[in-house]
């Protein structure tokens, strides 16, 4: 029965792991709902300011903010939003694949790259992969604050204003639904007018007290809001991916337990049959 004992031990071990993954699934469900609420609360502001900025990109203001001016691209910056923890399926891996592909296109064109990394997984990836990380922040927790991001974002904005980078993009996972998280690369600056806005409307604004003072503040708030929204959505995507990963792990553990239980029963039956045969053989010999 040595084989049966070993199988029994494996079954007990897998059942213990199954309890852990099941508990983690339930925790992820709760955290995902809270993350979705935060995402829904911040999304209207992020979308509205994006619309206003889109109108500005099509307008002809008396003051052209540096974020509104296209220039030859020699160096680009990425704000990479990753998670702090693992056990969330291929969420970070898919994000890094998308980013590396975009970086490869830039490098083929002779464009250099600077990185601002949000999240421990992103920092660990670029330590191994290589890259010029100029700013990093991690351990934002389950309720990230925009105040925690301002310092890192400012590093990239200052680099753009000083002419050290010519384009800034944010890389993150978009929360589509519970089953789908989409890695995206979105250009933040210089501003990009959406085609629909460009075709249908041309907007002009009156600025008070003056265009420079208003736009200087608005442009910074725009970038900060988009990065914060990316962090909040990535957090919701992380919890959804973790919930699915833990559910799959729990289900797979159940299937493995069933298979091992069948093997155990067969091994036990074979051992009993052998014992009976030995008893019968011994009785016949007597």
From Swiss-Prot:
GO terms for biological process: proton motive force-driven plasma membrane ATP synthesis. Produces ATP from ADP in the presence of a proton gradient across the membrane. The gamma chain is believed to be important in regulating ATPase activity and the flow of protons through the CF(0) complex. Belongs to the ATPase gamma chain family. PROSITE patterns: ATPASE_GAMMA. It is found in: Cell inner membrane. One of its GO terms (molecular function) is ATP binding. Pfam families: ATP-synt (PF00231). InterPro entries: ATP_synth_F1_ATPase_gsu (IPR035968), ATP_synth_F1_gsu (IPR000131), ATP_synth_F1_gsu_CS (IPR023632). This is ATP synthase gamma chain. Keywords: ATP synthesis, Cell inner membrane, Cell membrane, CF(1), Hydrogen ion transport, Ion transport, Membrane, Transport. It is a peripheral membrane protein.
């Amino acid at each position: 029965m040595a084989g049966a004992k070993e199988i029994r031990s494996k079954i007990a071990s897998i059942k213990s792991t199954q309890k852990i993954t099941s508990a983690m699934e339930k925790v992820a469900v709760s955290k995902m709902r809270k993350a979705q609420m935060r995402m829904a609360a911040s999304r209207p502001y992020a979308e509205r300011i994006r619309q206003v900025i889109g109108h500005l990109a099509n307008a002809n203001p008396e003051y052209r903010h540096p974020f509104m001016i296209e220039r030859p691209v020699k160096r680009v910056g990425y704000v990479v939003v990753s998670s702090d923890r693992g056990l969330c399926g291929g969420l970070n891996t898919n994000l890094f694949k998308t980013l590396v592909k975009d970086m490869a296109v830039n490098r083929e064109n002779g464009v250099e790259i600077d990185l601002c990394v949000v999240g421990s997984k992103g920092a660990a990836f670029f330590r191994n992969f290589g890259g010029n990380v100029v700013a990093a922040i991690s351990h934002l927790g389950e309720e990230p604050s925009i105040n925690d991001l301002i310092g890192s974002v400012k590093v990239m904005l200052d680099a753009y204003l000083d002419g050290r980078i010519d384009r800034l993009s944010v890389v993150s996972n978009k929360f589509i639904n519970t089953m789908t998280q989409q890695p995206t690369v979105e250009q933040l600056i210089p501003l990009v007018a959406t085609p629909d806005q460009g075709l249908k409307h041309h907007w002009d604004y009156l600025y008070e007290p003056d265009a420079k003072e208003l736009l200087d503040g608005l442009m910074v708030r725009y970038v900060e809001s988009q990065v914060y929204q990316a962090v909040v959505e990535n957090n919701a995507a992380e919890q959804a991916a973790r919930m699915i990963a833990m559910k799959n792990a729990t289900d797979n553990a159940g299937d493995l337990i069933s298979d091992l239980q069948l093997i155990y029963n067969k091994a036990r039956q074979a051992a009993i049959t052998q014992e009976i045969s030995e008893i019968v053989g011994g009785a016949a010999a007597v």
